Amino acid sequence: MRLTVFAGREAYPSLAAELEGAEVVRVPVTARSRVRRVLAEQTLLPAAARRARIDLLHNTLNTAPAIAGLPQVTTIHDVIYKRFPETAGLLNVGVAVLVPLAARRSRRVLTDSEASKEDIVRFLGVEADRVDVAPLGPGIPVPAEPVPEAELREELDLGDAPLVLTVAAKRPHKNLARLIDAVGRLPEDVILVVPGFETQFEDELRRRAGERVRFLGWVDDRTLDGLYRAATCFVLPSLAEGFGLPVLEAMLRGTPVACSRISALPEVAGDAAVYFDPLDTGEIATAVERLLGDEELRRRLREAGLKQAERFSWESTARATVESYRSALSNRS
């Protein structure tokens, strides 16, 4: 198999240096403008694909050229925008057109979980036997030298209080408002740590959060790794997830997990989490309080989480992806 990777201006230098055995082709477009990226996907990408004489085009982020001139596979990670239109904001109109179009134009659709497959079939009308599931592998890399916890706490001014960590975009379907309210019911020495980029929804979250909630903004991978390790537990209260990669990241580091009993999260966490109803603030608080107060439960979940995390690897993702390629090229559907 010959692999050709099409990369924009920002990604090209690192991909060209790192991807041995693959041809990396630079496409003159910036990833900083979503509108320009979509326009390039519809115009520059098909032309580059034809020049490269490839047999199959894999689009990895939900959308695809309307006219590619060759077979396509498209990864649609989720269709959460269908359940929560406010998540996509002003871009929702474009998303509502481009994602279903990509599904129709592709011989195969790849997605991250059985739950996302069900949503793609339901909301986009794609035939179930045309959708392949390729669960993701580990997220951020484990550093060779993790940041010492004392150093991390001092740098981020976290003191010595027990930490409850969540890693989620500040958008409505991530349900952070209920988590903040739930933490307000916990013992006073607990701190909820919320890393991640600011969004238009952050002001509302800050208004309901007290001093026990720390919004850190963007953090690098080494810092995020340190937060997972320093946390007494990790909580993901989402109302919808296409996969739930932070759950896997937490389990890989031996951090006990509490998460919503919805969509893809049980596929990822298996029996290695405390589950709750994400619409019930009291149930969220009870789940977190159980983890904070029960050392034996944390030990069991730590062991179960490490074992559960072993089920996921990028090698498995690659095998499922290649099988989808074969199906597309043989025109099986």
Which residue ranges define each predicted feature?
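Carbohydrate transferase catalytic cores enriched for Leloir-type hexosyltransferases
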Residues: 1-333
